[in-house]
Amino acid sequence: MARYTGPKCKLSRREGTDLFLKSARRSLDSKCKLDSKPGQHGRTSGARTSDYGLQLREKQKLKRMYGVLEKQFRKYFAEAERRRGNTGETLIQLLESRLDNVVYRMGFGSTRAEARQLVSHRAIEVNGHTADIASLIVKAGDVITVREKAKKQGRIREALDLASSIGIPQWVEVDTNKMAGTFKSMPDRADVARDINESMVVELYSR
């Protein structure tokens, strides 16, 4: 299945929440009408959505937020099931520790899609080695750096300025001048994906 390349607002409108697919340079309200579903006149409310439908929506929201396709998402879920602890929370931790997401959290990309592009274009190093796999799992203590030849890119400086004004998450430490950061630890569940009910995703895959 190909990665979605259509309008980002359409996905956020469909899920009725900000999926953080667009830069925060402008407020989401000025770009997307979240209270209006996709379609010429929006979808009218009908019968109550089934439990399965609600579970499916939560899964779609999570996949779209992190830019992960179904096959890969199932692998993350299987890995989360194998690990100790709460499966839903572990799933979100795995998604949060993807390299493209960490690059985004550090402010090197204004969106996860932009961060993914930086990785695929070999603009990022992990512990001194060039990394071009967006799904690479970053571990606590790993150092993420923008490569020297990429530091001149205006979009990276703009993204860092934006991240600094909004606030860089406490679970990463970033030197904006050196364009380098350390992934200190996994984030607390309460700090990420707040609009996601991961227990519904677990219920969906447990059917």
Curated annotation (Swiss-Prot):
Q: Which UniProt keywords apply?
A: Ribonucleoprotein, Ribosomal protein, RNA-binding, rRNA-binding
Q: Which molecular function term from Gene Ontology is one that the record holds?
A: rRNA binding
Q: Name one GO cellular component term.
A: small ribosomal subunit
Segments forming a coiled coil: none
Which SUPFAM superfamilies would you find in this protein's record? Alpha-L RNA-binding motif
Record region (Disordered): 31-51
Taxonomy, superkingdom: Bacteria
| Keyword Lipid biosynthesis (UniProt) | no
| Pfam families referenced in this protein's UniProt entry, alphabetically | Ribosomal_S4, S4
Any single biological process term in GO:
ribosomal small subunit biogenesis
- Give the family per the record: Belongs to the universal ribosomal protein uS4 family.
User: HAMAP family, per this entry?
Assistant: Ribosomal_uS4_B (MF_01306_B)
What is its quaternary makeup?
Part of the 30S ribosomal subunit. Contacts protein S5. The interaction surface between S4 and S5 is involved in control of translational fidelity.
Function (record text): One of the primary rRNA binding proteins, it binds directly to 16S rRNA where it nucleates assembly of the body of the 30S subunit. With S5 and S12 plays an important role in translational accuracy.
Protein name in UniProt: Small ribosomal subunit protein uS4
Q: Which organism is it from?
A: Bordetella petrii (strain ATCC BAA-461 / DSM 12804 / CCUG 43448)
